[in-house]
Swiss-Prot record:
Subcellular location: Secreted
Protein name: Fetuin-B
GO MF assignments: cysteine-type endopeptidase inhibitor activity; metalloendopeptidase inhibitor activity
Function: Protease inhibitor required for egg fertilization. Required to prevent premature zona pellucida hardening before fertilization, probably by inhibiting the protease activity of ASTL, a protease that mediates the cleavage of ZP2 and triggers zona pellucida hardening.
Region: Disordered, residue numbers: 264-306, 366-387
Gene from which the chain derives: FETUB
Glycan-modified residues: N37, N137, N271, T292, T295
GO cellular component terms, semicolon-separated: extracellular region; extracellular space
Phosphoserine modified-residue sites: S320
Entry comment describing in which tissues the protein is expressed: Liver and testis.
Signal peptide interval: 1-18
Residue stretches of biased makeup (Polar residues): 272-299
Species: Bos taurus (Bovine)
Domain spans labelled Cystatin fetuin-B-type: 25-139, 150-258
Length: 387
């Protein structure tokens, strides 16, 4: 009995002296795949798209066609979640300077369609009422001309970014001259052409969209008026057309213009946040601008977004060496390539004077997305759905 007791005591002593094996380093929590058609996901997609449109200074408002992928990365307790969304989008007829919500804008008719994809990283902290877009990238391209001809052979031939044809500039200048001649007092000048197309309707016809700015001149001053200041900003957008029917020596010119809301949009800082009501907004914006300034620390740099435009897919195929090239949208958005993730400083979003960081992961590929993704499309034409 004494021998048995001695063995037990020795065993316990050896166990107490032993050290536990080293534990593996903590790994970030895995991404959760979300249902692309759930109201929860669609609400977040709406906020993301509103912020993307609000951040842009050029181009047209983008509308949601469908959610292609949605992931959630839950952070430590009290820090909310980071979301990784891939959105299929369509261009609308509203210019971004109009500050119109995408839900109030009509998408372009089929032969004028511009479609594409946006990837976005979005931060939500419901407890602190913070909705914040740190990064996004979008890639767009016009609908294939061969698809238009096959579907609607009589539709106008769109060349949305082609300014090489001098007739487009002629259409813009002459239609604006017509508008100024009919304006009772104010005069306007051309800023830039934003969209072009042409069609044969009993003769050539040209269509343009262009931004205008207000001239300090009034009609009564005529040629005695000095040139407008170079710093003036666009105040509206015009749609002009010029037609030359066969057998008619004259030109048929038409023009309509709409003006942007003169009231400046609500300040939201250098990067947009939604539904955040800090106690001292000016301090929050100041901190936000400091945080977005270039620094030597990648964890404190908050990137902006961009929108790139690709040529018509037909032109892409013409220059390809492949027999049947597959259409792709090279939308890249990676704040890090480290599979373990890196920290992103979001302290400036919080009212409390403390350091707050979230873990950002490499943007996920679509291979791991939910079976409920992509969601149903608002416009299901195969020609305007990114593959």
């Amino acid at each position: 009995m004494n021998v048995l007791l001695l063995l037990v005591l020795c065993t316990l002593a050896m166990g107490c002296g032993a050290t536990s094996p080293p534990q593996p380093a903590a790994r970030p929590s895995s991404l959760l795949s979300l249902d692309c058609n759930s109201s929860y996901v669609l609400d977040i997609a709406n906020d993301i798209l509103q912020d993307i449109n609000r951040d842009r200074k050029d181009g047209y408002v983008l509308s949601l066609n469908r959610v292609s992928d949605a992931r959630e990365h839950r952070q430590e307790a009290g820090l909310g979640s980071l979301f990784y969304f891939t959105l299929d989008v369509l261009e609308t007829g509203c210019h971004v300077l109009s500050r119109t919500s995408w839900k109030n804008c009509e998408v372009r008719i089929f032969h004028e369609s511009v479609y594409g994809q946006c990837k976005a990283i979005f931060y939500i902290n419901k407890e602190k009422r913070i909705f914040y877009l740190p990064a996004y990238n979008c890639t767009l391209r016009p609908v294939s001309q061969s698809a238009i001809i096959m579907t609607c052979p009589d539709c106008p031939s769109t060349s949305p970014y082609d300014l090489s044809n001098p007739r487009f500039m002629e259409t813009a200048t002459e239609s604006l001259a017509k508008y100024n001649s009919e304006s009772p007092s104010k005069q306007y000048s051309l800023v830039k052409i934003t969209k072009t197309s042409s069609q044969w309707v009993f003769g050539p016809a040209y269509f343009v969209e262009y931004l205008i700015k207000e001239s300090p001149c009034v009609k009564s001053e005529g040629s005695s008026c000095a040139l407008e200041s170079p710093g003036s900003v666009p105040v509206g957008i015009c749609h002009g057309s010029l037609g030359e029917p066969q057998g008619n020596q004259g030109k048929i010119i038409s023009v309509t213009c709409s003006f942007f809301n003169s009231q400046a949009p609500t300040p939201r800082g250098e990067n947009a946040t939604v539904n955040q009501r800090p106690a001292n907004p000016s301090k929050t914006e100041e901190l936000q601008q400091q945080n977005t300034a270039p620094t030597n620390s990648p964890t404190k740099a908050v990137p902006k977004g961009s929108v790139q435009y690709l040529p018509d897919w037909d032109k892409k195929r013409e220059g390809s060496q492949e027999k049947d090239p597959v259409e792709t949208f090279p939308v890249q958005l990676d704040l890090t390539t480290n599979p373990q993730g890196e920290s992103l400083d979001v302290s400036f979003l919080f009212q409390e004077p403390m350091e707050e960081k979230v873990v950002v992961l490499p943007f996920p590929s679509k291979e791991q997305r939910s079976a409920e993704c992509p969601g149903p499309a608002q416009k299901g034409y195969p020609f305007i759905l990114p593959s």
